Amino acid sequence: MNKSEMGQGVYTGLSMIVADELDFPWDRVIVKPAPARDVYIDKKMGSQLTGGSTSVRNMYEFLRLLGASMKEMILESASREWKVPKEKLQARMGYVSYANKKASYGELWEKALKLPIPTQVRLKEPSEFIYIGKGVPRIDTKEKVEGKAIFGIDVRLKDMVYAVVERPPYFGAKVKSVDDSQARQIKDLLDVFTISSGVAVCAKTVEGALKGREKLKVEWTKSPLEGFDDERLSQYYLDMLKKKGVVARKDGNPALVLENTKRKISAVYLLPYLYHATMEPMACIVDVKEDRCTVYAPVQAQTWTLQTAKSITGLPEDKIEVYTTYLGGGFGRKSNVEFVKEALEISKKLKKTVKLIYTREDDVKSGWYRPMNATHLEGALDEKGRVVALYHKIAVPAVFEWAGRPSRVDRAAVEGIENMFYEIPH
């Protein structure tokens, strides 16, 4: 599965699509997370990424074609083996049958794989669906109820050590000096050193790492962001809202309607930076060797994780393995892989398998936050109270800029506005 399961049910939803066209029994469906490789990229996103509630929308057509193509190849395999016209065969619930002959998909699949992929296949009519649009048991329910599901925080590897990071009290600050003399007296502590985001504390136990961090004395450089507060931020965004922006969508002539309407509602809203509050704080396990790298992480962005590992280790992509665990919530936060970068730096320096842990306090203090924004809304109503014109202006940081995808209009900033489902003429 090229999408991350973070409680939204994507393992179940996408499997339903394939299993329906394939005519495969639901109780035999098993899902394995896909490795980070180009072949698993979501073509519509240009990345192996889960986010924006796009998984079913982006994958629906492809997965239906995949399931139907697999069934067609299995039928062709049976047709050749039994020397029976394909039209006379029946594929149902994981078996192909004809007269007194019957074979499972698995028995036919090895030979089917050697056949050319069909260029055209028949997709089911909605009336033929056996899973799509119907209720089925979730694939992940049983192992989660039984406590067998493995999240990022649950992974344990042989001889792994633990690490936590002391990060700056405000964004933009860097380590100026470190006094780790008291920290090094802590039992089980292995090492203390500086990484790009702060000071890493490594120990044989979680307790040792946390106690070691408590004993650190770190001096930080100054940062332009040090004096920022809610009042200054709010005024900054309100000022930005008054400046000219770029137009993401325009229908009709809203300015003219709003100017001449008798019933108009106008409001300005401020939304603060928000903590994502995933149930599972950031955690990952990384093992950097000279000739290979292994990452176990609850990430939404496998492509970015792979690229980060490649950048830190200098290894080619085929020497890097990324295993995606279950995510204890994501909400977009785990598409940022800076916590994986930290673990990569620590493992490379320490030359050991490292489990990096964020406490809840770390996660709140040093997370990536949903962006603050200011919004100006004006709406015109007709005599029946229907919205006939809408003006919606937003001042918000450009998400795609840091993601390396600059554009004139940041689609993430106007998602839900630009493509709204309400029919408003202006």
Residues covered by each model-derived region:
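Structural alpha/beta core scaffold segments of enzyme domains
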Residues: 1-426
